[in-house]
């Protein structure tokens, strides 16, 4: 018997670790584009899940952005059936009328489709093939836009996606390993042309910035960027817990926040309290930026009698009688 290729073994171990942490015995789904990362993940899941007594299926999303995308989706479905995965679905989405750039629109449509599929199929978890290299790219993009700790924490290994857990088992596996695993298993992954299209910021980071960093600083830079994300994520989680407790301590019975209590908090905790409160008020996470939180902060620590701080959705926050008070958007005339 031929020895198991080390990349294949590494990916199977990563999948086993992820699946053994699931409390629910329900099925898992792999989100698979047909690229090397998700294909290697799907192959590992098809091997590991049955040995843990867990059903495993696959979902592929066709964004319709490239010629032949429907054929690619059909090829993924056909392979999944031969690999023993079930249920298997291909979902076509329309990204043409969604707001934002094409990357953001495709991502939003994809995750909406995956969330609906996981709910419809009763999945306990949805697995995606994001790798260490994806994590390094995410950290660099966050640095470039001046993100805070939450952005520098990168992609979490798990989070809720509707009623299912979204798992990223391969965040400590390199892209080189997923490609090598596909080669060892005789799989022919699809290459997404968008991954090398310089019109996209992530593609430029992937093809230009990361290779330059590796040449200048050595190959360990990718591991170190991913490690930074893990360390920052741990610190962020601890601060978030403190902020949850602190928020309860500064709430006013009318739903506002007591300025005196806010002023006594450490700045890192206070910023999180204001961010969480703004989300509770209805500000969408994707629209809520550091500028909105800074405006709330100014009502606490930079008070000069100024007017309202404005939040996404038309919400207005005033400082009145020693507390922050929200006013709903004005109704249309």
Swiss-Prot record:
GO terms for biological process: tRNA modification. The keyword Cell wall biogenesis/degradation does not apply. One of its GO terms (molecular function) is tRNA(Ile)-lysidine synthase activity. Keywords: ATP-binding, Cytoplasm, Ligase, Nucleotide-binding, tRNA processing. InterPro entries: Rossmann-like_a/b/a_fold, TilS/TtcA_N, tRNA_Ile_lys_synt, tRNA_Ile_lys_synt_N, tRNA_Ile_lys_synt_subst-bd. It comes from the Bacteria. Its EC number is 6.3.4.19. ATP binds at residues 33-38. Pfam families: ATP_bind_3, TilS. It is found in: Cytoplasm. It catalyses: cytidine(34) in tRNA(Ile2) + L-lysine + ATP = lysidine(34) in tRNA(Ile2) + AMP + diphosphate + H(+). Its main location: cytoplasm. One of its GO terms (cellular component) is cytoplasm. The keyword Lyase does not apply. Ligates lysine onto the cytidine present at position 34 of the AUA codon-specific tRNA(Ile) that contains the anticodon CAU, in an ATP-dependent manner. Cytidine is converted to lysidine, thus changing the amino acid specificity of the tRNA from methionine to isoleucine. The N-terminal region contains the highly conserved SGGXDS motif, predicted to be a P-loop motif involved in ATP binding. Belongs to the tRNA(Ile)-lysidine synthase family. This is tRNA(Ile)-lysidine synthase. The gene is tilS.
């Amino acid at each position: 018997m031929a020895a198991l290729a080390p990349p294949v073994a590494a990916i199977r171990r990563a999948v086993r670790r992820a699946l053994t942490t699931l409390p629910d015995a329900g099925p898992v789904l792999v989100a698979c584009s047909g690229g090397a990362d998700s294909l290697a993940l799907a192959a590992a899941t098809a091997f590991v899940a049955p040995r843990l007594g867990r059903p495993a299926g696959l979902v592929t999303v066709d964004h319709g952005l490239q010629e032949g995308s429907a054929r690619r989706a059909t090829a993924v479905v056909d392979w999944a059936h031969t690999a023993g995965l079930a249920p298997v679905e291909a979902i076509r989405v329309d990204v043409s009328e969604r707001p934002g750039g094409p990357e953001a629109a495709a991502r939003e449509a994809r995750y909406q489709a995956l969330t609906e599929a996981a709910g419809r199929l009763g999945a306990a978890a949805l697995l995606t093939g994001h790798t260490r290299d994806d994590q390094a790219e995410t950290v660099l993009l966050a640095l470039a836009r001046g993100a805070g700790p939450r952005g520098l924490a990168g992609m979490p290994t798990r989070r809720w996606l509707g009623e299912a857990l979204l798992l990223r088992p391969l965040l400590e596996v390199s892209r080189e390993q997923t490609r090598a695993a596909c080669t060892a298993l005789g799989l022919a992954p699809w290459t997404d042309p968008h991954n090398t299209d310089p019109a996209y910021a992530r593609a430029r980071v992937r093809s230009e910035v990361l290779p330059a960093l590796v040449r200048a600083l050595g190959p360990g830079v990718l591991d170190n960027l991913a490690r930074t994300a893990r360390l920052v994520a741990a610190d962020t989680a601890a601060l978030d817990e403190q902020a949850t407790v602190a928020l309860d301590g500064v709430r006013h019975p009318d739903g506002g926040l007591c300025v005196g209590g806010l002023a006594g908090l450490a700045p890192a905790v206070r910023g999180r309290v204001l961010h969480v409160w703004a989300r509770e008020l209805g500000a969408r996470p994707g629209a809520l930026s550091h500028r909105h939180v800074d405006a709330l902060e100014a009502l606490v620590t930079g008070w000069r009698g100024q007017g309202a701080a404005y939040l996404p959705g038309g919400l207005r926050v005033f400082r009145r009688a020693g507390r922050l008070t929200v006013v709903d958007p004005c109704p249309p005339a």
